[in-house]
Amino acid sequence: MILRTAEPRDAAAIAAIWNEIIDHTAITFTTERKTPEGIVADIASRGPAFIVAEDAGRLAGFATYFPFRGGPGYAHTKEHSIQLEDHARGAGLGRLLMAELERVARAEGVHSLWAGVSGENPGGVAFHAAIGFTPIATLPQVGFKFGRWMDLVLMQKIL
């Protein structure tokens, strides 16, 4: 398994991982599919804060962070996203990606990482708790997908 900074050539594979999750799960509330062009723009704007896991030449997942909120007062706080192909879950890849993302975050002066985890994703909540994130709040019924309202669990880790 190789962890490395995402490159534009990864955009189609990243979009494919995202779109499988968007189309078939409540892990994310979004229903808007990702495009390779949009991913290329994200890679360009995030630089080393967009990490991919490559296994035998194929992407198995990615982790990235982005501004939590606008304004200079939030400059050292980031929200992150980690997504894995279904076959890659439960084998420790998520821990590896997050350890590398946290290393990059510390090097870039990030103080606080946030996760917004779907209440429909208890595995995601457990994963984040296991790597040191603290549940801060549950926002009831703020997401709507697949014809139903869903909760969002906010989790934070001080680096």
PLM feature segments, named:
Residues 1, 58-62, 150:
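Glycine-rich phosphate/pyrophosphate-binding loop shared by adenosine-nucleotide-utilizing enzymes
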Residues 2-16:
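A short beta-loop-alpha structural element at the N-terminal edge
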Residues 16-33, 42:
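Helix-loop element at the rim of GNAT/NAT acetyltransferase active sites that forms part
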Residues 31-87, 98-99, 104, 158-159:
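Acetyl-CoA-dependent GNAT
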Residues 64-67, 72, 114-117, 129, ...:
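Conserved catalytic-core motifs of GNAT/GCN5-like acyltransferases
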Residues 89, 115-125:
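Conserved beta-strand-loop-alpha-helix junction that forms the acyl-donor binding cleft
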Residues 90-103, 126-130:
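Conserved acetyl-CoA-binding loop-helix of GNAT-fold acetyltransferases
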Residues 105-117:
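Conserved GNAT acetyl-CoA-binding A-motif
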